[in-house]
Structures are given as C-alpha cells and as structure tokens.
UniProtKB/Swiss-Prot annotation:
It is found in: Cytoplasm. The keyword Nucleotidyltransferase does not apply. Belongs to the RuvA family. One of its GO terms (cellular component) is Holliday junction resolvase complex. This is Holliday junction branch migration complex subunit RuvA. Homotetramer. Forms an RuvA(8)-RuvB(12)-Holliday junction (HJ) complex. HJ DNA is sandwiched between 2 RuvA tetramers; dsDNA enters through RuvA and exits via RuvB. An RuvB hexamer assembles on each DNA strand where it exits the tetramer. Each RuvB hexamer is contacted by two RuvA subunits (via domain III) on 2 adjacent RuvB subunits; this complex drives branch migration. In the full resolvosome a probable DNA-RuvA(4)-RuvB(12)-RuvC(2) complex forms which resolves the HJ. GO terms for biological process: DNA recombination; DNA repair. Keywords: Cytoplasm, DNA damage, DNA recombination, DNA repair, DNA-binding. Has three domains with a flexible linker between the domains II and III and assumes an 'L' shape. Domain III is highly mobile and contacts RuvB. The RuvA-RuvB-RuvC complex processes Holliday junction (HJ) DNA during genetic recombination and DNA repair, while the RuvA-RuvB complex plays an important role in the rescue of blocked DNA replication forks via replication fork reversal (RFR). RuvA specifically binds to HJ cruciform DNA, conferring on it an open structure. The RuvB hexamer acts as an ATP-dependent pump, pulling dsDNA into and through the RuvAB complex. HJ branch migration allows RuvC to scan DNA until it finds its consensus sequence, where it cleaves and resolves the cruciform DNA. It comes from Shewanella sp. (strain ANA-3). GO terms for molecular function: ATP binding; four-way junction DNA binding; four-way junction helicase activity. The gene is ruvA.
C-alpha cells in the first residue's frame, strides 16, 4: 500500500497532479483544499496518499496532511459515500469546516455541495458524528484539531484561468452552466485559476 510520496511536482491541473518519485510518475487526485497547498511545478513536495484498487482501475488520492487523509478515509466508510463524493466534499470545505458542520448539525451547508442531497447530508451527520468522536479520542496534539494551515501563494495569472476553473468545477460534479456562472461572477482581473476556483466554490456555499 502506498501511504506517502516524496518527489518533484511535475504537473498540476486541478484536481489532478503528477509527482515524479525517483523517475516514476505518480498520478493523484487531490481535494482542492490540499491542491491549494502545493508548491510551484518542478518543486519538491510530500503528500500523504490513499490507494484504491478497483476492477477497472488503480487510483491514488493525495493529501497535504494526515488529518485530511484520515477524514477522507472516514467519509468513504459512510453509507453511500465513495471516493469521488468524499473528494468533492473536501474540495468544497476544509476538514475543520466539515467537522464544524457535523458538530452544528449544519445540513444547509452540506446540501450545497454537488452530489450531496438532503438524505445524504442527514446520513453523513449521523454517521460521521460517532466516527469523528472515536477518531478524536484516539488522536493527540494537532491531530485533534483538523486544522489545515495554508502556505498557499497564487501562481502567476494565465490566460486560460476561467477555462481551467470551469473545467475543475465540472470535474467535481457541478453542471457546466452552474460552473460557468459561478466562475464568471467570481472572476476579477488578475486572478489565477486556483484563486478563481476557490472564489467560485465559496460563492456557491
């Protein structure tokens, strides 16, 4: 099982990245909360991973912190939640924000995420409350907090910022018209694609 990768970031196009580890390129999918923490291309990076084996594919999911990976693993154990939906949830809010939703029984915020209907949100609140309690009791220090410290610095602006942002939102489950509208409303001159994605997601929650 692959639990961690340390190498050079070769490509990043939300939500996918390619990391070179001793000449071997590993493709990963990452929630946007972790994606924002990545360094620039051609810089060294370390990510914690979760490896999924299916009949038709072998998939790697990457996370900047162990805490976020732990939450991802709890989410995919919940009834009706697979890796794709778990990735979408953690792209729409940080781990600490999700924990806050569970603690407050905040179903309104959860149903705004693509793929999360009222029944799914209600089930998540019930199932995750006990799972998170058990995890917190077993953790110590910073692992109890589920707080993601951000050192993200926006990359230089690119001409295709809006197109990249729309594509990223669609890949997370948003419908094309919804993604396009959110990106257009959030866009400000000089924005790079990653900042634009974050702003568009925030406007929809």
């Amino acid at each position: 099982m692959i639990g961690r990768l340390r190498g050079v970031l070769i490509e990043k196009q939300a939500p996918e990245v390619l990391i070179d580890v001793n000449g071997v390129g590993y493709e990963l999918q990452m929630p946007l909360t972790s994606f924002y923490e990545l360094p620039e291309v051609n810089q060294p990076t370390t990510v914690y991973t979760h490896f999924v084996v299916r009949e038709d594919a072998q998939l790697l999911y990457g996370f900047i912190t162990k805490q976020e990976r732990s939450l991802f693993r709890l989410l995919i154990k919940a009834n009706g939640v697979g890796p794709k939906l778990a990735l979408t949830i953690l792209s729409g809010m940080t781990a600490s924000e999700f924990v806050g939703c569970v603690e407050r029984d905040d179903i309104v915020t959860l149903v705004k995420l693509p793929g999360v209907g009222k029944k799914t949100a209600e089930r998540l609140l019930v199932e995750m409350r006990d799972k998170l309690k058990s995890l917190m009791e077993a953790s110590v220090g910073s692992e109890r907090e589920f707080v993601l410290q951000s050192n993200y610095s926006p990359a230089p602006t690119v001409n295709s910022a809006e197109e990249d942002a729309i594509s990223a939102l669609i890949s997370l489950g948003y419908k094309p018209p919804q993604a396009s509208k959110a990106v257009s409303a959030a866009y400000k001159e000089g924005m790079d694609s990653e900042t634009l994605i974050k702003a568009a997601l925030k406007s929809m929650l």
